[in-house]
Design a protein with these regions (language model features):
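Catalytic domains of carbohydrate-active enzymes, especially glycoside hydrolases
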Residues: 41-58, 106
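N-terminal amphipathic alpha-helix/helix-capping segment at the start of soluble metabolic enzymes
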Residues: 1-27
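N-terminal active-site wall of soluble small-molecule enzyme domains
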Residues: 56, 61-111, 121-122
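Catalytic alpha/beta core domains of metabolic enzymes, predominantly
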Residues: 19, 123-257, 261, 266, ...
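Hydrophobic faces of well-ordered beta-strands that scaffold small-molecule active sites
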Residues: 24-30, 52-56, 90-92, 111-113, ...
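Domain-level signature for soluble enzymes in the chorismate/prephenate branch of the shikimate pathway
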Residues: 267-361
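Glycine-rich, proline-tolerant flexible connector loops at the mouths of alpha/beta enzymes
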Residues: 55-74, 237-246, 306-315
Length: 361
């Protein structure tokens, strides 16, 4: 784990949008603003159960040309109407300085950078400079690939331009593996971001992780279990007619039901008995962790010696048969102890990679 990074961040409660506790802070609205009627009807449905921050895509960076790419600036007038009639804060995605200037012109309260934009430092810098001397919050989605440093770099660029109302949106990452979700949740990325930037508010975007509405509840609950601050969820008055991402959008009443189903646990407890028990268990974990590191160090020493012996006898470092045997034994042990087999494989593959590096050294 890398060292914590020092960002200057205005606390979420000082943005004027949200109030913590309770969690989650919620941003909701359609994937895309499609018509005035659709925007207003959706906003009315969301406002009815207390949603105060309304999102809608105005410009849509689509994978294929010719797909619906958003209505553009005219949609900002509909957003403006939402703000005026329902008293909701409004936010949308920006991908360049032109978008920023249009948003400022129409009184948009908050903007976010999409995953593709975050992956391009030139665009991030352009947007940061366009937002200089403004006071609107900026949320940043993680890049499409699991690159935490690239994500943190976007916050640093915003900070350098004096922007301190910043927050993260974790939307999962692209994967070539066949999984049930649209994007791999990669929760470790959000956990590591919190460790390195503890002051940064983090929202989850279960809509883009899921790809299908049937998975939204489980992903939202997981975000709460991990202590994330909020959710950005796509909601449409009639998803069957949506021009983009129809399968992952909820009608407002279903979003209300989802939010009411979430179990949100406290970050700590004042109960002395609880604290004593937790301290005792954590002390056990500390000892186990120390032993783990000692055993890993010992294993690496043995790996180095094996490497030396192989070099002396001109034997190749990697011997697939031996590694298959080691992994098979580890998986069998995992099964015996009730451990997740994929987890054990991941750990052993990381150890194997480090061992090969030691032997090559």
């Amino acid at each position: 784990m890398s060292a914590a990074r020092q960002l200057t961040v205005t606390p979420l409660n000082d943005w004027g949008f949200f109030r913590l506790p309770p969690r989650p802070c919620v941003i909701a609205g359609p994937c895309s603003a499609e018509s005035e009627e659709q925007v207003m009807t959706t906003a009315e449905g969301l406002k009815a159960f207390g949603i105060n921050v309304f999102r809608a895509g105005i410009w849509k960076p689509r994978t294929h040309p010719g797909s619906f790419e958003g209505v553009g600036a005219p949609g900002l007038k509909w957003m403006q109407k939402v703000k005026k009639e329902y008293g909701m804060r409004i936010c949308t995605e920006v991908a360049g300085e032109k978008h920023v200037f249009e948003c400022l012109k129409y009184g948009v309260d908050m903007v976010w950078l999409g995953a593709r934009t975050t992956a391009n430092p030139f665009l991030v810098q352009e947007i940061a400079e366009a937002l200089r001397d403004t006071d609107i919050p900026v949320l940043v989605k993680n890049p499409v690939n699991p690159d935490l440093d690239l994500w943190i770099g976007a916050f640093e660029r915003l900070n350098r331009e004096g922007i301190t109302k910043i927050g993260a949106i974790h939307r999962g990452v692209s994967t070539t593996e066949k999984i049930k979700y649209r994007n791999a949740p990669e929760w470790d990325m959000a956990v590591e971001l919190r460790a390195r930037c503890p002051e940064l508010p983090i929202f989850a975007d279960p809509s883009h992780m899921a790809g299908k509405r049937e998975y939204l509840q489980e992903l939202s609950q997981r975000a709460m279990d991990l202590g994330l601050d909020g959710l950005m969820v796509e909601s449409h008055c009639d998803p069957s007619c949506a021009l983009s991402d129809a399968a992952q959008q909820l009608v407002p009443p279903d979003l209300q039901a989802l939010l009411e189903s979430l179990v949100v646990r406290d970050a700590s407890s004042a109960d002395e008995k609880f604290r004593d028990e937790l301290s005792r268990l954590r002390a056990q974990i500390d000892v186990i962790d120390e032993n783990l590191v000692f055993d890993l160090a010992t294993r690496m020493k043995v790996s180095r010696k094996i490497g030396e012996v192989k070099k002396q006898h001109s034997v190749a470092i990697i011997q697939a048969g031996r590694w298959d045997e080691v992994l098979e034994k580890a998986v069998a042990s995992a099964r015996q102890y009730g451990l997740d087999e994929e987890f054990v494989k991941t750990v052993y593959n990381a150890i194997h990679e480090a061992s090969v590096a030691e032997q090559n050294g």
